[in-house]
Swiss-Prot record:
Pathway: Quinol/quinone metabolism; 1,4-dihydroxy-2-naphthoate biosynthesis; 1,4-dihydroxy-2-naphthoate from chorismate: step 2/7; Quinol/quinone metabolism; menaquinone biosynthesis. This is 2-succinyl-5-enolpyruvyl-6-hydroxy-3-cyclohexene-1-carboxylate synthase. PANTHER family: 2-SUCCINYL-5-ENOLPYRUVYL-6-HYDROXY-3-CYCLOHEXENE-1-CARBOXYLATE SYNTHASE (PTHR42916), PROTEIN PHYLLO, CHLOROPLASTIC (PTHR42916:SF1). It comes from the Bacteria.
């Protein structure tokens, strides 16, 4: 197999609504031109001049108000598209430009008709992506091209429509095998759809199932929690609430907070399978939840977002809705009277929460109990809690329990890095509200110089530091036990945070036990300045305790 994977790409674009394709002759683009033509459903046009071809495609898109495919060969051909691309960008006209290219091994070696086509049109396109040839035995060989087609189509029609570049590196043989059955490969049982604004009748039909699940990720939209709680009550749907969604500030029977733990149970995963899934905000942090979504690959997966961008790495999205959460929730007319699916989730939640709460009896220094202690002392405050990535956000995911509260939990989950946490926390602290940073030792070391601005501007911040002397998260991952594990992954540093606190002018305290933590935290949160409460833990002991308290027993 060489370029057969492009057939589903052609099919998916047609299914989405593309009807016209414009080609300029070329060798490297042979497969693209032939596959579009042999599909026999497109209106195709050939123009020997790429510059003219691009403006011709622009005219079609302008007249019909829908994306048009524009195909060219490798090398200088794409450069001739540039004038029309700039016009499309500024006029907000949707085009999908497919630039055939030489494969990676022929780049930068003097191969003819070859130049760097990466992001060739710069800021004049809404989206750029390489459509690489997937591995022949890959599970997603036929579905991956469809996802690329969906992203291209959605990006071309986003809030500000415009051109999109999909760069297609192609290897010899360039002439494709024209098998009509290839066009249908990788099709989903539920065809992909997208909507802008309200489509209440369609969504009422899509949500006919009584097994509807709501995923609530981080989202700063106004009335986010209230809208989802209203929708959940209407649909009798459990809400799997990521800690950054702040839905755990509501002690609602619809809110689930311990799902990451109990979704480790295979029997439960089967029993809790959904028929409709609604995603709002970012995908929650839980890896087990993402695995559960992949298991529900026959469910109707509806992503609701103001922007037409993917937020589901399991690649199971069937419907994209460009809408804010309140508008969408208000458009749903369906009312479900069947509580049985919700009750299954509530039963698992209650059982798991009972197990997690046993950590309150733990005497060894353990992150899970310290998170519970932190929540207890923050409960009465109108406070802000920034949580660093790596293990800390996962500790919060496991141990932060739903309750009526005003604590706003924040995190940098855009690209999930561990840098910049102190600086971000101090930026949050400028609001004047009580502000806490929960961080790990490596995260803190990445941004020590960020503390300077806090001293300069006399900001107030309490830092709760889990120091396990290195990368504790790797003790939970597949790297645990590999050769040179400590050297390559765990990376113990042995640094003295008391000395670092003295260097940066922080008020420092080494926490000795849980009672000491409570006393020191209550003192620091009420006093001005930057306070560092260091909690030393052991990576191996923490792993053992984590397994002990998160085990779900049938």
């Amino acid at each position: 197999m060489t370029n057969e994977y492009l057939a589903p790409f052609v099919d998916e674009l047609f299914n989405l609504g593309v009807r016209e394709a414009v080609f300029s002759p070329g060798s490297r683009s042979t497969a693209l031109a032939m596959l579009f033509e042999e599909y026999k459903k497109y209106d195709t046009y050939v123009n020997i001049d790429e510059r003219s071809a691009a403006f011709f495609a622009l005219g079609i898109a302008k007249a019909n108000r829908r994306p048009v495919v524009l195909v060219c060969t490798s090398g200088s051909a794409a450069a001739h598209h540039f004038p029309a691309i700039t016009e499309a960008k500024m006029s907000r006209i949707p085009l999908i430009i497919l630039t055939a290219d030489r494969p990676a091994e022929l780049q930068f070696v003097g191969a003819p008709q070859t130049l760097d086509q990466t992001r060739f049109f710069g800021n004049f396109v809404n989206h750029f992506e390489n459509l690489e040839a997937p591995q022949p035995q890959a599970k997603n060989f036929w579905t991956y091209p469809r996802k690329v087609a969906q992203r291209a189509f959605l990006s071309a029609l986003d809030q500000m429509a415009g051109p999109v570049q999909i760069n297609v590196p192609l290897r010899d043989p360039l002439v494709p095998k024209l098998k009509s059955e290839n066009y249908e490969k990788g099709r989903y049982k539920l065809p992909f759809k997208f909507f802008k604004g309200q489509q209440s009748a369609f969504f009422d039909e899509a949500l006919l199932s009584s097994k509807t699940l709501i995923l609530a990720g981080a989202n700063s939209a106004e009335n986010y929690s209230e809208s989802l709680l209203k929708l959940a009550e209407q649909l009798k749907a459990p809400i799997l609430a990521d800690p950054l969604s702040n839905l755990r500030n509501h002690n609602s029977p619809f809110v689930m907070d311990s799902y990451d733990a109990f979704l480790a149970n295979d029997d439960l995963k089967t029993d809790l399978k959904a028929e409709s899934i609604l995603l709002f905000g970012q995908m929650p942090v839980s890896k087990r939840l993402q695995q559960f979504i992949a298991l529900n690959d026959e469910a109707q997966f509806i992503q609701v977002d103001p922007a037409l961008v993917y937020r589901n790495p399991s690649l199971t999205t069937t419907i994209m809705v460009q809408s804010n959460v309140t508008t969408f929730a208000n458009s749903i007319q369906k009312v479900n009277q069947d509580f049985s699916y919700l009750e299954k989730w509530q039963k698992a939640q209650e059982k798991m929460r009972h197990q997690l709460e046993k950590v309150a009896q733990e005497e060894n220094p353990f992150e899970g109990r310290f998170v519970q202690e932190l929540q207890k002392h923050l409960k009465a405050l109108d406070a802000q809690l920034l949580v660093s990535n790596s293990m800390e956000i996962r500790d919060i995911d496991y141990w932060w329990e739903k309750e009526d509260s005003k604590v706003r939990i924040l995190g940098n989950r855009g690209v999930n890095g561990i840098d910049g946490t102190e600086s971000t926390a101090l930026g949050i602290a400028t609001t004047g509200k009580p502000t806490v940073l929960l961080t790990g030792d490596l995260s803190m070391l990445h941004d020590l110089n960020g503390l300077i601005i806090g001293k300069t501007h006399e900001l107030n911040l309490t830092i709760v530091l889990f120091n396990n002397d290195g990368g504790g998260i790797f003790h939970h991952l597949a790297q645990k036990g590999v050769p040179n594990f400590d050297y390559l992954f765990s990376t113990p540093h042995g640094l003295n945070f008391e000395g670092l606190a003295e260097l940066t002018g922080l008020d420092y305290h080494l926490v000795s036990n849980y009672a000491d933590f409570g006393q020191q935290f209550e003192t620091s949160i009420c006093q001005p300045g930057i306070h560092l409460l260091e909690i030393k833990t052991d990576k191996d002991l923490s792993l053992a305790l984590h397994k002990k308290y998160t085990a779900y027993e049938n």
